[in-house]
């Protein structure tokens, strides 16, 4: 009895101590994870078939294999859940949580530990980092063909100056676009041959550019801003090699890195828009060429007559009537008002005002009308760079509507014209006086001018005629208040015009009034003398001065010309 008492007392004592100690309670709750001795491990392994061998052997092989592996090599001991269980037991003993809430707290603590401080998380991160390194290495191996090109390009760029005199932004933006071209396009290579570097592209046929000569040609053109009329003279400075480089790099540029106000930015934008148009209507030329080749004519020069006939007799299409929707017109008025206020109140340049207006737009408003706003802002940017006066008039005019070129993409901005009324000293009165003076001088010849200077102020037919012309002109220029008087003045002017005689008629009447003079014929002697050996002794059939009247009468001005 004593022995039994001694056996039961410790067990009761141990259970009481475990209930008071959370760590012992957690150890008892997680008993399968404690360390086993070698004898316990052997007995556990052999106990798989101790009961009934046929029962164990009849199980699937996968289940038997898992049981054997687990019995021989148990899973790694992880005390995390034991520690969490200890914490939960301590919270229950202290009254922080109820006993029925322990399972939820235990699950939440395990989930948080596995999320933020778990070996599995670290291993997953290591696997993810390994996958990333493998993907990067694979990408580098795929692009191994461009590594040599990038190395050659970097060595070429190392020889270029870091800064230029002007246009530093355009210079760095163009270099970035060139790097993007070499790294992204698979059929593009850069190599060195002697002191020169070459760029070779095989996208649409093999095209080779001498980078050294191209950058030497572009050296004085970085940041050059050329107006519309001076672009032709600057265009002559670019070589075909440089133009090809600009054409290849243009798809990788934008108006942010390279300013569109500069000449190179204008060319790159032009090339980029030209390459962006995929639809080219060349069916007529292809059909005519195919028919000609089928007929045995390989020379395309013989097709000029056919092509000229097709171009001459093509049907003309009625121009489309472009107009804005009410919503688009409201957008135009909003942008006009915003840009004009920025320019007048904040004293910003046109380009800065457009940029600030675009930056302050509401995102939802811009997202709903993105295409039209981009098109309108691009049109205003072009107008501000090419025709500032036209841009100012378009922004300040509350009734302005975009022209046809805005819809078709053919931008043709009008140039400034110097009108007569632009001068500060000109007026309509001065213009009228100049016209009257010119009208009087038109009907006066040189003889009448000299006579008018020498003779006193006696009225002459010419002066009376001038006065009549002036009166008639004044009557026409003055505003006509009475219709009857205007008709009478027109009749008087017509009667005077009918009585006027032309210079030809006056010369004919004067010639008819003169008596006819018969001049004796001149006889030339057969014997030539030295005194008369001047080349004019014989009549010349090419120099005939016979006849009466003034031989230069046909050079005098005619008075019969109309106003």
Swiss-Prot record:
Residues 449-472, 522-543 are annotated as: Disordered. The modification Phosphothreonine is found at residue 284. Cleaved near the C-terminus by the viral protease during virion maturation to form the mature protein. Its main location: virion. Residues 148-261 are annotated as: Binding to hexon-linking protein. Residues 549-563 form a propeptide. Induction: Expressed in the late phase of the viral replicative cycle. Residues 1-117 are annotated as: Peripentonal hexon-tethering domain. The modification Phosphoserine is found at residues 235, 452, 456, 475, 486. It is found in: Virion; Host nucleus. Residues 462-472 have a biased composition (Low complexity). The record marks 548-549 as: Cleavage. It holds the Pfam family Hex_IIIa. All late proteins expressed from the major late promoter are produced by alternative splicing and alternative polyadenylation of the same gene giving rise to non-overlapping ORFs. A leader sequence is present in the N-terminus of all these mRNAs and is recognized by the viral shutoff protein to provide expression although conventional translation via ribosome scanning from the cap has been shut off in the host cell. Belongs to the adenoviridae hexon-linking protein IIIa family. Structural component of the virion that acts as a cement protein on the capsid exterior which mediates the interactions between the hexons, including the peripentonal hexons, and reaches all the way to the penton vertices. Two hexon linking proteins IIIa, one from each facet, stabilize the unique edge interface between a pair of facets. As the virus enters the host cell, hexon linking proteins IIIa are shed concomitant with virion acidification in the endosome. Interacts with hexon proteins; this interaction tethers the peripentonal hexons to hexons situated in the facet. Interacts with the penton protein (via N-terminus). Interacts with packaging protein 3; this interaction is required to promote correct genome packaging. This is Pre-hexon-linking protein IIIa. It comes from Canine adenovirus serotype 1 (strain CLL) (CAdV-1). The lineage of its organism: Viruses, Varidnaviria, Bamfordvirae, Preplasmiviricota, Tectiliviricetes.
């Amino acid at each position: 009895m004593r022995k039994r008492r001694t056996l039961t007392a410790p067990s009761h004592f141990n259970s009481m101590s475990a209930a008071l100690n959370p760590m012992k309670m957690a150890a008892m709750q997680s008993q399968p994870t404690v360390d086993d001795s070698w004898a316990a491990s052997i007995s556990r392994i052999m106990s798989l078939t101790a009961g009934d061998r046929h029962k164990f052997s009849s199980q699937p092989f996968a289940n038997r294999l898992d049981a054997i592996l687990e019995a021989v090599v148990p899973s790694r001991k992880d005390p995390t859940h034991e520690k969490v269980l200890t914490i939960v037991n301590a919270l229950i003993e202290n009254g922080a949580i109820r006993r029925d809430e322990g399972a939820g707290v235990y699950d939440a603590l395990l989930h948080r530990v596995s999320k933020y401080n778990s070996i599995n998380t670290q291993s997953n991160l290591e696997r993810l980092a390994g996958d990333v390194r493998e993907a990067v290495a694979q990408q580098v191996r795929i692009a191994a063909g461009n590594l040599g090109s990038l190395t050659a390009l970097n060595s070429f760029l190392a020889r270029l100056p870091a800064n230029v005199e002007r246009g530093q932004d355009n210079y760095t933006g163009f270099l970035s676009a060139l790097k993007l071209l070499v790294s992204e396009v698979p059929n593009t290579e850069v190599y060195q041959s002697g002191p020169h570097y070459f760029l070779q592209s095989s996208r649409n046929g093999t095209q080779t550019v001498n980078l050294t000569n191209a950058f030497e040609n572009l050296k004085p053109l970085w940041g050059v801003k050329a107006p519309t009329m001076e672009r032709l003279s600057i265009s002559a400075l670019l070589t075909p090699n440089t133009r090809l480089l600009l054409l290849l790099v243009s798809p990788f540029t934008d108006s942010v890195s390279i300013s569109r106000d500069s000449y190179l930015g204008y060319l790159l934008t032009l090339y980029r828009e030209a390459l962006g148009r995929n639809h080219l209507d060349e069916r007529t030329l292809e059909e005519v060429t195919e028919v000609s080749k089928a007929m045995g004519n390989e020379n395309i020069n013989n097709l000029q007559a056919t092509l000229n006939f097709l171009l001459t007799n093509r049907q003309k299409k009625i121009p489309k009537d472009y107009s804005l929707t009410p919503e688009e017109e409201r957008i135009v008025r909003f942008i006009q008002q915003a840009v004009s206020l920025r320019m007048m109140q904040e004293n910003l340049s046109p380009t800065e005002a457009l940029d600030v207006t675009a930056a302050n737009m509401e995102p939802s408003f811009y997202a709903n009308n993105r295409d039209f706003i981009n098109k309108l802002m691009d049109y205003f940017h072009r107008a501000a760079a090419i025709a500032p006066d036209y841009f100012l008039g378009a922004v300040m005019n509350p009734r302005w509507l975009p022209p046809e070129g805005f819809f078709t993409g053919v931008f043709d901005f009008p140039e400034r014209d110097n009108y007569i009324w632009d001068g500060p000293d000109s007026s309509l009165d001065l213009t009228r006086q100049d016209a009257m003076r010119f009208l009087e001088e038109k009907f006066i010849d040189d003889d009448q001018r000299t006579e008018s200077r020498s003779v006193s102020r006696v009225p002459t037919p010419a002066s009376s005629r001038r006065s009549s012309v002036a009166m008639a002109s004044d009557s026409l220029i003055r505003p006509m208040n009475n219709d009857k008087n205007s008709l009478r003045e027109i009749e008087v002017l017509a009667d005077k015009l009918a009585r006027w005689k032309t210079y030809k008629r006056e010369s004919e009447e004067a010639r008819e009034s003169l008596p006819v003079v018969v001049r004796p014929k001149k006889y030339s002697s057969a014997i030539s003398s030295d005194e008369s050996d001047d080349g004019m002794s014989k009549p010349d059939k090419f120099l005939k001065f016979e006849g009466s009247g003034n031989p230069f009468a046909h050079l005098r001005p005619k008075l019969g010309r109309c106003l």
